[in-house]
Amino acid sequence: MESRIAIVGANGVGKSTLLKLLVGKLELTSGNSYRNGRLSLSMFTQHHIDQLKLPLSPLEQFMTDFPGATQETYRSHLGSFGITGNLALRPNYLLSGGQKSRVAFSLAMWKNPHILVLDEPTNHLDIDAVNALIVALNNYNGGVIIVSHDQHLVSTVCEEIWYIKDTRLKKFAGDFEDYRRMLSMGKL
């Protein structure tokens, strides 16, 4: 379960919809899907900041969303995402966009899911936050499925490229550079 997969394709072909189907945020309108009942998935989206409870601090949000651990455990987890010291006590609405993204990513990672599903995760991130995300994903022991137009993220994190065209998901035999080259030549 340590696969690193990028799903690419033109805007509007259904990449985000596919991810929502995978994590159960949407239901199929036809056909069947099967998933191991013990499989845990977590999703981090381009709208990740929307999941934050803005009046709460990151520490308070963890205590509310995932009760039962010690403050030290929450703070240690937040610290591994760069939310340290007084930052963990500051209301979410006072955090920068990059800091909010780190809090949201730490929330997605709390239960150590088997597979992390990311939908345009670098939107709204500064370069430092993008690099921190890349390091975190490369150190992550589970599987990763990413929808992104960010060539640096995909090239640095993903080992497989899958593309959607004409409502079909197909594995691409090559890396992201090869995919872009084939696309520019009109061969996909």
Residue ranges and their predicted role:
Residues 1-188:
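ABC ATP-binding cassette signature C-motif
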